[in-house]
Design a protein with these regions (language model features):
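N-terminal loops that bind phosphate or other acidic moieties
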Residues: 1-367
């Protein structure tokens, strides 16, 4: 895929189905409960209707796709974890032995791990090979990747979403594995939102004070060197991004293209989602946020999208670890929408709710 083909593909993405959303809100108003009493579950069911075009939905078959890649910037000492852990954990994901994959296995969720840039030539066949390189370049010295590679990474993500759609998945969780990607994601967010590096950079997996100061300095120096254009997502991704972030952005785009509900599972995923929305604002209609990340920068990105995560569990693992839990929330939303009785079916006169219905504070809100 080249940039012209990417633009043509983005032009095919259509907004959420407003008629289906309106019909879903109408059904919510007839269910035997006080208006708005199921809170976010009502909003989720309405947004799902907009994505699928159906008022009633089921979230039965789910998948989490993990994009694994190394980041050359770790050569600058910005990560406390050795780079070899990327491959080790990618393998462990295929065995159900990481945080995300253990939870996913317990819930019966399919996990697909894709190598988009692991720095190893000994990646097992249980990991899908879509390698774009042996990690990105060290962006403190040169651009992380070429624009062509950034587009290729987006295409890999789009392909993964299409594959999930074709497999019959009802929702797709987006995951990652890549030592150093809190550094790349902070650099990307600082560019996209034009924010100071200090306000979007966290400690990652546990840097010391000295390491944390180094991390912020490395990012600041790289931004000064490359001067990424925040209005050009491909410029930002190619200069200071990662293969995993670009592929995740592509997965969000692919989900919008194939009307498959995607879940952003935490910090790095949210930044990738923001990049996808900057490429095509309509993608926002299709994104769900599972849980608030403990890491700094999450709030700024969520506010930019105008979205709130469903859960606050003080999580900061990454991997897409919030997605398995989020799928259960989506199932709950669908169960209420599909299976609750209406006032008429429950033989309840709902006239007593008229005043409550007239109060906007109790209306179903959708983003």
């Amino acid at each position: 895929m080249n940039e012209t083909e990417l633009k043509a593909l983005l032009s095919r993405i259509r907004p959420a189905d407003s008629a289906a959303k309106a019909a879903a809100k109408e059904r919510q108003s007839k269910l035997a409960k006080p208006p708005g009493s199921l809170g976010a579950l009502e909003e989720i069911s309405v947004r799902l209707a907009g994505i699928t075009g159906r008022v009633c939905n089921r979230i039965e078959k789910t998948r989490i796709v993990v994009f694994a890649a190394d980041n050359g910037i770790v050569a600058e000492g910005v990560a406390s974890t050795p780079q070899c852990v990327t491959l080790a954990q990618a393998i462990n994901m295929t065995r159900g032995k990481t945080g995300m994959s253990a939870i996913a296995r317990d819930f019966g969720i399919d996990v697909e791990v894709i190598d988009v840039g692991i720095n190893s030539d000994s990646v097992p066949e249980t990991i899908l090979d879509r390698k774009l390189g042996f990690g990105t370049a060290n962006f403190s010295k040169q651009p992380a990747m070429t624009r062509s590679q950034a587009v290729d990474a987006l295409a890999i993500g789009i392909e993964a979403a299409e594959r999930a759609h074709n497999s019959g998945a009802d929702a797709l969780g987006i995951g990652e594995m890549g030592i150093g990607n809190t550094t790349t994601s902070a650099a990307v967010l600082a560019c996209l939102l034009n924010l100071p590096v200090e306000s979007v950079t966290g400690r990652g997996s546990g840097l010391t004070d000295e390491g944390f100061a180094l991390k912020k300095r490395v990012i600041s120096d790289a931004l000064a060197l490359h001067k990424p254009n925040g209005a050009d997502v491909l410029d930002v991704l190619s200069k200071v991004g990662g293969f995993d972030i670009a592929a995740m952005a592509g997965a969000f785009i692919g989900c919008a293209l194939f009307c498959l509900p995607p879940v952003a599972g935490g910090l790095v995923f949210l930044f990738a989602a923001l990049a996808a929305v900057r490429l095509c604002k309509t993608v926002r209609d299709f994104i769900f946020l599972s849980h608030a990340s403990y890491e700094i920068g999450y709030r700024a990105a969520a506010a930019e999208l105008g979205m709130e995560p469903w859960l606050n569990l003080n999580m900061r693992l990454g991997e897409g670890s919030g997605c398995p839990v989020a799928f259960q929330v989506m199932r709950a939303a669908c169960a209420a929408m599909n299976d609750m009785a209406t006032f008429e079916e429950a033989s309840i006169n709902d006239n007593y709710l008229e005043n409550i219905r007239n109060e906007s504070a109790f209306c179903v809100k959708t983003v």
